[in-house]
Regions:
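GST-like fold's C-terminal all-alpha helical module
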Residues: 7-127
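Long, positively charged, glycine-interspersed low-complexity recognition regions
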Residues: 116-157
Length: 157
């Protein structure tokens, strides 16, 4: 499950977040300054993401990413019909990983997917994860993210 979340779910959710939020930031930086900033990013994949965020992903790429997210939601819904938690009958890192990358905010990021109507087991699972004492405590913490970078709100500024 963790490999699936890390290599599948996170990439496609991230693409939408970068397109919606980071793209606005990247496009607001003047051309020469942006190129200079790119040179300072040590990881080639991150440089490519910033450059792509500036130009934007194609509608076809975004639609394909959404299809992959739907696949993930269907896979999770099916699994939760068989076991109480993602990796079996015990709460594990798989639950924490999926919750933090997709499960917690998927409805806010993708309202068009009608998560509550189509994935009731996932919604129940999310509520059970959210109610866990450590998760509830973490969610009460102050959000220290700069307001302009809060990608889960659906707004950049």
């Amino acid at each position: 499950w963790n490999k699936f979340v890390d290599e599948h779910v996170m990439n496609y959710v991230s693409m939408h977040g970068w397109h919606r939020m980071v793209g606005i930031i990247a496009r607001s930086i003047e051309g020469g300054e942006f190129e200079q900033l790119l040179e300072n990013i040590p990881l080639p994949d991150q440089r490519k993401k910033w450059a792509t965020a500036r130009s934007g992903w194609s509608e076809a790429d975004l639609a394909a990413a959404t299809d992959k997210i739907v696949y993930a939601l269907e896979k999770v819904e099916k699994q939760l019909g068989e076991t109480a938690w993602l990796a079996g009958n015990a709460y594990t890192l798989a639950d924490i990983n999926f919750y933090s990358h997709c499960g917690m905010m998927v409805e806010r990021m993708f309202p068009e997917l009608e998560v509550a109507a189509k994935y009731p087991r996932l919604v129940d699972w999310r509520e059970r994860v959210t109610a866990r004492p450590a998760v509830a405590e973490a969610l009460k913490s102050e959000d220290r993210t700069a307001p302009g970078l809060r990608t889960w709100s659906g707004h950049v500024r």
